[in-house]
Amino acid sequence: MTRRYWNINLEEMMEAGVHFGHGTRKWNPRMAPYISAKRKGIHITNLTRTARFLSEACDLVFDAASSGKHFLIVGTKNKAADSVASAAIRARCHYVNKKWLGGMSTNWSTTETRLQKFRDLRAEQKMGRLNRLPKRDAAMLKRQLSRLQTYLGGIKYMTGLPDIVIIVDQQEEYTALRECVTLGIPTICLIDTNCDPDLADISIPANDDAIASIRLILNKLVSAICEGRSGYIRNR
């Protein structure tokens, strides 16, 4: 893996609240090596370790992007959804930011069928064919299209399983993480002090509840993806 400098600044992470964990009663003992202190009933994450694992994750995604690999970013809770979408769009990654439909990756054939239906309905709408149908039929198909856009809009260009999955909030996206583990898809996961650091391939200890923290971590990762991808495009 190529080791590069990613300008990961401890002061910047502190300003974003990356170091704030959960209450000391809500913690996973396996997170002990990643916790540096307790303050007012809250665990404080060791930002030196955060920087180390974030740098490793940036190296991984840079190398993957340099060889044309595809990424999926998953984060469906309200505080993460907008940051996930904007980061993914910036780096031209696929994303899921509303709801992970069970079996989305492990039952890929069903997902492919849904995606094809989504593409067909989008094409019908663009050509104005839905408006030529009886009102009841048109309304039903438009509702179906709206639902597909909500849940599959971020993966509408996916033609196969991703090469690497980036997950915001291990507990919230546990189903997605387990599916990736089952399929052997490498994962990078933001983990708060209530998570299990051993589940993902690279776990980044960080506050997964603060928007600023989520945005900072994602921005570092997608910057590495963009840099790697630009090199891939130049060398093609």
Curated annotation (Swiss-Prot):
One cellular component (GO) term of this entry: chloroplast
**CDD domains linked to this entry:** RPS2
Q: InterPro entries, from UniProt?
A: Ribosomal_uS2, Ribosomal_uS2_bac/mit/plastid, Ribosomal_uS2_CS, Ribosomal_uS2_flav_dom_sf
Please give the superkingdom of this protein's source: Eukaryota
Q: Which UniProt keywords apply?
A: Chloroplast, Plastid, Ribonucleoprotein, Ribosomal protein
What's one Pfam family here? Ribosomal_S2
Chain segments annotated as coiled-coil in the UniProt record = none
Q: Where in the cell is it found?
A: Plastid, Chloroplast
The name under which this protein is listed is Small ribosomal subunit protein uS2c
Native organism is Chloranthus spicatus
Organism lineage:
Eukaryota, Viridiplantae, Streptophyta, Embryophyta, Tracheophyta
